[in-house]
């Protein structure tokens, strides 16, 4: 199954399960959880079901395309359902069957692995899903986002698209994956990966990154004061990416790291609080009356 067909099939499956099918969010982020369709919608009383593919950037993970299964840019497929439905594990296994992976023919294990994002003030309990010894999915019942308790509890299912594609296509390297019948993953992303790694590790200007972080932090604070939740979150995500770029350059001390994380977490918490306040003023419109 081609890479693009995996996304299309997951869209079809989760659409039939009642999920909105959304598009990626248009700013750099380290995980699909940072998309407002997850980070904001996971909190508050309103029900929410959404699925989407999300490109993610983690600058420190770059290897100039030399590592067969590690890159600074990759794709997740994100599913959020709130409240979490019964038999969600069975639905997930059925989604694998929809991709051509019969659970009866493979060793599929749910390995306990609780999840945490310090910068988002988010955590949850759940499992890694292993398929014949390779992790392919993270399964998490969110407990908090932005430091706010989740009630009702949402389920997050995060598929690692490259790993699933490697399994389906029997490939040893993400760079050999077939995006479609004519174009490989490397034809699209290898030059991008090399360029971005050069920037991440050698050519970004740390002093400018520090200045940008301060500017983005100031902008986020200003927007939070005005209860402009969405643009405020945009600037929190920009702060997070600046921090990740500084980390990739190796210019952050242990003390600085803790301070940067706390600054981002504080902003994320205030954005989440602002979101709840906005939705409450709207009488939580998605709650069924």
From Swiss-Prot:
CDD domains: GlyRS_alpha_core
GO CC annotations on file: cytosol
GO biological process: glycyl-tRNA aminoacylation
EC number: 6.1.1.14
Record's keyword annotation contains Nucleotide-binding: yes
Top-level class of the enzyme under EC nomenclature: ligase
InterPro entries recorded: aa-tRNA-synth_II/BPL/LPL, Gly-tRNA-synth_heterodimer, Gly-tRNA_ligase_asu
Annotated catalysed reactions: tRNA(Gly) + glycine + ATP = glycyl-tRNA(Gly) + AMP + diphosphate
GO molecular function: ATP binding; glycine-tRNA ligase activity
Keyword tags: Aminoacyl-tRNA synthetase, ATP-binding, Cytoplasm, Ligase, Nucleotide-binding, Protein biosynthesis
SS bond partners: none
Compartment list: Cytoplasm
Pfam families in alphabetical order: tRNA-synt_2e (PF02091)
Keyword Protease listed: no
Subcellular location, principal: cytoplasm
Family: Belongs to the class-II aminoacyl-tRNA synthetase family.
Assembly and binders: Tetramer of two alpha and two beta subunits.
Xref: NCBIfam families: glyQ (TIGR00388), PRK09348.1 (NF006827)
HAMAP family documented for this protein: Gly_tRNA_synth_alpha (MF_00254)
Name of the protein: Glycine--tRNA ligase alpha subunit
